[in-house]
Amino acid sequence: MNVFRISGDVSHLLAIIILLLKMWKSKSCAGISGKSQLLFALVFTTRYLDLFTVFISAYNTVMKIVFLVCAYVTVYLIYGKFRKAYDSENDTFRLEFLLVPVIGLSFLENYEFTPLEILWTFSIYLESVAILPQLFMISKTGEAESITTHYLFFLGLYRVLYLANWIWRYHTEKFYDQIAVVSGVVQTIFYFDFFYLYITKVLKGKKLSLPMPV
């Protein structure tokens, strides 16, 4: 394990904590895409099915459990405790547009044609596009709260750091995971415009706004 991997995990965890604290303190899930959070819960579920069969390290096991629990707590807060504040009118991204191609690709491009491996591959592909409903929701409403933008920033930073992790591992171990790297690059690309707006607006105290779709 290297500093990029650890930093990426910390950034990922910070993003989730920021999101949960935002909802808990405001008693609202306004501005948060429940569909994106459902996809992330599905990502962690299908990726960590080996939780009780494969042991790599205590750190690895603990982080898996933390991400799983946080994902389902987030979904519960949105669709359960704070469901009255859920903005379903603007959270309208069609999930089948993501799930159908991701499922198909998981069967076509994987390292081993076994249930666990296909589900792991599915989770990697799905994570690369899981944020799209949230970005679509922001573009539809035209703006995002500062806390939501901080959440997205750390989520994007996590992916950038994981790309650095793969580069470092290739340099030091000659290890290359094509599926993870390509999916990570795709996911990072989705954040480029957001990173630019975050740096030029949010960090200067301005509200992030996006052009509304025609």
Curated annotation (Swiss-Prot):
Residues 204-207 are annotated as: Important for recycling of cargo proteins with the sequence motif K-D-E-L from the Golgi to the endoplasmic reticulum. Disulfide bonds: none annotated. Residues 1-4, 53-58, 111-116, 169-178 are lumenal. The record marks 193 as: Important for recycling of cargo proteins with the sequence motif K-D-E-L from the Golgi to the endoplasmic reticulum. Belongs to the ERD2 family. The record marks 5, 117 as: Interaction with the K-D-E-L motif on target proteins. The chain crosses the membrane at residues 5-24, 33-52, 59-79, 93-110, 117-135, 150-168, 179-199. It is found in: Endoplasmic reticulum membrane; Golgi apparatus membrane; Cytoplasmic vesicle, COPI-coated vesicle membrane. GO terms for cellular component: COPI-coated vesicle membrane; endoplasmic reticulum membrane; Golgi membrane. The keyword Lipid metabolism does not apply. Binds the C-terminal sequence motif K-D-E-L in a hydrophilic cavity between the transmembrane domains. This triggers a conformation change that exposes a Lys-rich patch on the cytosolic surface of the protein. This patch mediates recycling from the Golgi to the endoplasmic reticulum, probably via COPI vesicles. Receptor for the C-terminal sequence motif K-D-E-L that is present on endoplasmic reticulum resident proteins and that mediates their recycling from the Golgi back to the endoplasmic reticulum. The gene is kdelr3. InterPro entries: ER_ret_rcpt. This is ER lumen protein-retaining receptor 3. Its main location: endoplasmic reticulum. One of its GO terms (molecular function) is KDEL sequence binding.
